[in-house]
Amino acid sequence: MATGTPAHEFRELDNAELENRLKDAKEELFNLRFQKATGQLTNNRRIGTVKRDIARIYTVLRERELGLSVAPGAEA
């Protein structure tokens, strides 16, 4: 079963690690879409899971930008 990463796990990461995770997730989504187009995708649910993970990462980054949450190790 394709399960995503909970938001609280993303909140424990610093901004640099979140950016790396975002880049990796976007690459994975690209590859999954390519597999779907060529008929090689075996788990269709994974596309939605990766898209939700990307949205969660963007949400955590935006919360930090607005000052609603603080990155770990950073003092307010």
Swiss-Prot record:
This is Large ribosomal subunit protein uL29. PANTHER family: 60S RIBOSOMAL PROTEIN L35/50S RIBOSOMAL PROTEIN L29, LARGE RIBOSOMAL SUBUNIT PROTEIN UL29C. InterPro entries: Ribosomal_protein_uL29, Ribosomal_uL29, Ribosomal_uL29_CS, Ribosomal_uL29_sf. Pfam families: Ribosomal_L29 (PF00831). Gene3D superfamilies: 1.10.287.310. One of its GO terms (molecular function) is structural constituent of ribosome. The lineage of its organism: Bacteria, Bacillati, Actinomycetota, Actinomycetes, Mycobacteriales. Keywords: Ribonucleoprotein, Ribosomal protein. Belongs to the universal ribosomal protein uL29 family. CDD domains: Ribosomal_L29_HIP (cd00427). One of its GO terms (biological process) is translation. It comes from Corynebacterium aurimucosum (strain ATCC 700975 / DSM 44827 / CIP 107346 / CN-1) (Corynebacterium nigricans). GO terms for cellular component: cytosolic large ribosomal subunit. It comes from the Bacteria.
